[in-house]
Amino acid sequence: MGMTLPDITSSENVASAAPLKWVGMEGITVPIQVPMSGEVPAYVNAKTDVYVSLDKSDAKGIHMSRLFLKLNDILGTELLSSTSLTALLNELILSQQGLSQGAKVNLDFALTLRKKALLSNEFGYQSYPIGISTQLVKGVARTVLSLTIAYSSTCPCSSALAQQALSDAISQRFDDEMISKSELTQWITSKTGAVATPHSQRSYAYIKLTLDGDALPNLPELITLLETTIGTPVQTAVKRQDEQAFAKLNAENLMFCEDAARRLKRALERKENVLDYWFKVEHQESLHAHNAVAIDFKDNADEDTM
């Protein structure tokens, strides 16, 4: 004969009856399948938080183990999409048998993409931090996508000062009005011709998008769009011609943090299925011991909670 195990969540009375906004678990590891552009899915491990609302005031607590099982059954087996996330949220609510009217899931993972060099046939891999927070409350869905883009920024002011220093050095080095082209190019490419260089630094764009309903964009395509918008994404494996091409890209895209922010703003304003956005660009200055930042968000976005 099987032993009946006690279940105090259903047998004991609640000392102080009250509903609770969210109850659940955090830091669960779940393997997920991320769709890739024309490729097989990427299999990554996501740190997952899962919650349901406790709307029944006199209930001792939620059925927590059922949340764990639903995560495994759906996220662990199906392709990550708006469809699978919506199905998961609905199943989480149903699993509570009337205790809950809302469910929420947070996913944090790193998506690794293959990146080709600018000119050569070299390639490497780059990891992008991704966060997805999706919730369904009384039939209303809300999804927030977070991602980080790393890029290079070269200071326009520093570039102008470096050019001026080079111009002054040329004037001092060559007295005659007519300068030999070969002599000038030979001097510029020599050690003495390296008069000054503009400062540049690794920079980051931290972006949060509130999506329309439960729509989930193709992540590799979104990352490519944002990197193209900024113009100077960091590279992986490079040869000398790639490094030179990257130097030219930086010269063509001199930018203060305000310039990078305005580029992102224009792109996000035109992006379909984006209801709200919040972003911060951060230039980790090599000239200073502090960072230069710019923050922007839509009028109806909440700066503190996005």
From Swiss-Prot:
Pathway: Cofactor biosynthesis; 7,8-dihydroneopterin triphosphate biosynthesis; 7,8-dihydroneopterin triphosphate from GTP: step 1/1
Reactions catalysed according to its record: GTP + H2O = 7,8-dihydroneopterin 3'-triphosphate + formate + H(+)
InterPro entries, sorted: GTP_cyclohydrolase_FolE2, GTP_cyclohydrolase_FolE2/MptA
GO biological process: tetrahydrofolate biosynthetic process
GO MF annotations, alphabetized: GTP cyclohydrolase I activity
Source species, domain of life: Bacteria
Alphabetic keyword roster: Hydrolase
PANTHER family, sorted: GTP CYCLOHYDROLASE MPTA
Xref: NCBIfam families: PRK13674.1-1 (NF010200)
Chain's role: Converts GTP to 7,8-dihydroneopterin triphosphate.
Family: Belongs to the GTP cyclohydrolase IV family.
Protein name: GTP cyclohydrolase FolE2
Source species: Pseudoalteromonas atlantica (strain T6c / ATCC BAA-1087)
Gene expressing this chain: folE2
